[in-house]
Amino acid sequence: KILTIKHSTKNVYTSKYQREATSYLTKWKKGKRTLDAPLLVKNPYGTLSTSIYFYAVSTEPLYAKYTITAKGAETISGTLAGGSEANVRLTHEYLIPGLAAGRKNTVEINFYNAANEWKKTVRFSTTPKKEKAIPKIKKVKNGKSKTAVSLGFYAMFGHDKSDATNIYYYDNNGVSRGLTPLNGYRTDRILTVDGNWIFSYDIDKLAVMNRLGH
């Protein structure tokens, strides 16, 4: 079951919204959260609309790799939390980004030990709602290059003359992978500093977001 936090305010860039998310997660993590029964929460901090928060404790140190598949969308895969054979852990707390909006997504997380031996697979399916605010890609045109296209998970921002001032994410198939809401003012860039994202969310305000979307 994927849980949803009922926030008392809609503005994600307030300490109240962020504290509510942390409070709920802290409470829910107190249960026995194993790889067979992980905690799954939809976009707890409100910053990546189609993301899923994952929390579980394993019986031995492991690292995790994920794959997201959805009909008509590009398959997205990666290693969670910068994990590797040198970064195994017992406590697994991740934000899985980039599920395809309005489509049934199957998320598969594979866990490995420091010797790169497979130990466990966790799999679940969910259909994130389609956001009206997300601009549609009307046409996808194949280019002439014979070079293989790299894994696509792109951010689009910097609208000068548009009310659609959020940060939007797409894959190589032009399928929406969610959005990061902004407060009515476009951002020009996303900086990565010490593993955090830094971007403007209002005309005179910056957000610093960690790997959990907080």
Question: What do the PLM-derived regions correspond to, one by one?
Answer:
Residues 3-14, 38-53, 57-63, 91-92, ...:
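Histidine-/acidic-rich catalytic cores in large beta-rich domains
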Residues 14-35:
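Proline/serine/threonine-rich low-complexity linkers at boundaries of modular beta-sandwich domains
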